[in-house]
Amino acid sequence: GGVINIITRESDDPWNLNLNSRFSEHNDQRYGGTVGFNAGKFNSLTNVQYNNVDTYAVDNPGDFSTVFGSRVWNFKERLIYHPLETLKLTGRAGYYFRERNKPGDTQDRYRGFSGGMKANYTFNIMSNLEVGYTFDQYDKSDYQSLYKNDVRDYSNVQHNVHALYNYTFNGKHTLTVGADYLRDYLMSYQFTDNADHTMHTADAFGQFDWNPTERLNVIAGLRFDYFSDSNVRHLSPHLGMMYKIGNCSLRGSYSQGFRSPTLKEMYMVFNMANMMMIYGNPDLKSETSHNFSVSAEYTKNRYNFSVTGYYNLVHNRINTVYSEDPKGQIYTNTDKMDIAGIDANISAKYPCGLGYRLSYTYIHEFMHDGQKKFTDTRPHTATVSVD
C-alpha cells in the first residue's frame, strides 16, 4: 500500500494545517503534515511525510520469504504568485529519500529530486499561453555502512521545456499549438562499465477543434517528433469525428502512433538475477502504428451503453527475443502485426446511490505464417462492479 499526495487546488483560507499519523503491524509508522497559507498574491502549500517499517518474514516457502524494512522521507512545496490578474506563476520543488534495509553491510538508497516553474498568461477570453520548465532526477546508490561510502550506480536526469498556446474562434472553435524539448541523461549499472548516454528529443504539434454545428465535432491534429540518438524525424497525423443523434453519440478516428526506442532498449547489458542476460540494440528502429476506431454511446436517464471497435496495424514493434549470439534476451524489432478488438460497457446509477458497471473486452492478434507470439494477452476479459 502507499499514500500519494497530489497538490492541485489553491486554498482560499488564510492558513490551514493538517497533521496525520498511522500505526500498523511490523512497526509500520507514518507521520505527515501539510501547512498552507494564502496572503494576497501569494499561495503556498508545503507537505512533509515520514514512513518507517521493520523487516519481517512472510509465510512463503522459497527464496522470497522476507520483506525488508525501510525508511522514507518525502518533501513537497508549491508556491503560486499572481503579479497580475492575467498572469499566474507557479513554482514547485520536491525531494524523496528511501533507504531499504537488507542483510550485510550495504543498504539500498533511492533519491528523487524534482522542480519546475510554469507561467500562465491570459491575453483575453479567446487566447492564453502556458510556458514551463521541469527538472527531474532519480538516483540509486549502495551505502557501505562500514566505510560510510555512498556509491551511486544509477542516475536519470531530465530537463524539459514546453510551451502551449490556445486560441478560440467565435467561442466554439479552438486552435492549439505547442512544442516540447527534453534532455534525457541516463547512467546505469545496466550499461557496460556503468556507462552513460544522453538523448535529446523535441516535438511540435498543432490541433484544431472544429464545431460547425451543435451535433458535429471534428478534431484534426499533426505532430512532429525528433530523437537525436536514433536520428529519427517523424510526422504523426490524427483525425477524429463525433456526431450526436438524440441520446446517441457516434465517433470515428484515425491516428498514427510512434515510439522511439529508449536508452535502456538500445544500450542495456544487464544480468537479470543470474537467470539470464538482457541486451540492448543500438540498431533498433522506431515503432509505428496506424490506429482506426469507431464507437457508439447511448445515454438515457441513469443508463449508459457504449461499444467500441478498433483495428491497429503495428510495424517494428520493440520486444525482447531469445538470442544465441549474444546468448540471452535481446531487444529487437518484431514482424508486422495487426490487432483488432471490441470493448463493450453497460452502466447505471440509481437515486439511492447504488450503481453497477458491466464490461467486456475482446482482443485478437493476427499472426502471419511462422510468426512468433510475444504477448500473453487474454482474448476475452469481463468485469462486473457494484458501488
Give the predicted meaning of each segment.
Residues 56-63, 96, 101-108, 134, ...:
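Outer-membrane beta-barrel translocator domains and adjoining extracellular loop/strand segments
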Residues 2, 15-17, 29-33, 73-77, ...:
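Hydrophobic, lipid-facing positions within transmembrane beta-strands of outer-membrane proteins
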Residues 5, 12-15, 22, 34-110:
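Periplasmic-side early beta-strands and strand-to-turn transitions of outer-membrane beta-barrels
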Residues 211-218, 298-299, 306-314, 332-387:
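Gram-negative outer-membrane beta-barrel transporters
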Residues 139, 185, 228-230, 234, ...:
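Surface-exposed extracellular loop regions of Gram-negative outer-membrane beta-barrel proteins
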Residues 21-25, 39-41, 50-54, 95-99, ...:
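Transmembrane beta-strands of outer-membrane beta-barrel pores
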Residues 45, 80-97, 109-244, 298, ...:
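Face-selective signature of the C-terminal outer-membrane beta-barrel domain
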